[in-house]
Swiss-Prot record:
Transmembrane segments: 29-49, 51-71, 97-114, 120-140
Pfam families, sorted: Cg6151-P (PF10233)
Domain of life: Eukaryota
Family: Belongs to the TVP18 family.
The gene coding this protein: TVP18
Organism: Meyerozyma guilliermondii (strain ATCC 6260 / CBS 566 / DSM 6381 / JCM 1539 / NBRC 10279 / NRRL Y-324) (Yeast)
Bilayer topology: Multi-pass membrane protein
UniProt name for this protein: Golgi apparatus membrane protein TVP18
InterPro entries: TVP18/Ca-channel_flower (IPR019365)
Amino acid sequence: MALSISTVMSNVFGGFSADFKKKNFSLYGQWIGLFTIILCLALGIANIFHASLVIIFSIICIVQGLVVVFVEVPFLLRICPLTDKFTSFIKNFDENWPRCGFYLLMSVIQWLSLTLQTTSLIVVAVFFALASACYALAAIKHQEYLKTSFNVAGEQGSLEAQVGEHVVRNVL
């Protein structure tokens, strides 16, 4: 049984609303981080066509988006062939304070792009700062670091989830 788009979307938005009901800032930071991945890739590619040194920050933005993918979707660390150094580097960010610092550093790098020219990369800088603030609030409030509960394939007992788990097992 194939997954339909409506099933996937309802599972994603169901997980999204379930996460927001928990009132945990680390979950908010994770969702902002996931959205920032899309922004990094889109705005990094869009700004790469500037005829100035902004190209450097565009490339950095694309690389940041790819690194954030591995930080926010740890499942990819298991299925992608990566070096042990990179994997251990990414695993350092499994708590609120390290993620706060990580996103703050990413934000500062993109804020520095404003020294060259004002571009849409400021949006990426703002969202990195928001993610950092969410992780900082979670750490200050002593909230447990949680990972999002959304499951694209559905609930654990559903047929779609079993098919998704079977595919993952075959990949691994």
